[in-house]
């Protein structure tokens, strides 16, 4: 699960880059939302992975 969240976070970063740079102005809002959603998912997965190993 952590592996997938990192992959989706990278995809969100790429989408955010295109959205924030004006290349795809129509998709900027979607990229911003995806960036923060996957950032939260990544943090939750990292914390869950740390506590699961104990």
UniProtKB/Swiss-Prot annotation:
Q: Which UniProt keywords apply?
A: Cell membrane, Membrane, Transmembrane, Transmembrane helix
Q: Where are the transmembrane segments?
A: 6-26, 30-50
Principal subcellular localisation of the protein: membrane
Q: Where in the cell is it found?
A: Cell membrane
Keyword Membrane assigned to the entry: answer is: yes
Tell me the HAMAP family matching this sequence: UPF0391 (MF_01361)
What protein name is recorded for this chain? UPF0391 membrane protein Mfla_0947/Mfla_1091
Organism, per UniProt? Answer: Methylobacillus flagellatus (strain ATCC 51484 / DSM 6875 / VKM B-1610 / KT)
* Biological classification of the source: Bacteria, Pseudomonadati, Pseudomonadota, Betaproteobacteria, Nitrosomonadales
């Amino acid at each position: 699960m952590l592996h997938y969240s990192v992959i989706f976070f990278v995809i969100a970063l790429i989408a955010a880059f295109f959205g924030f740079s004006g290349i795809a102005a129509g998709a900027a809002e979607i990229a911003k939302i995806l960036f923060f959603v996957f950032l939260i998912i990544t943090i939750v997965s990292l914390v869950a992975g740390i506590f699961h190993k104990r």
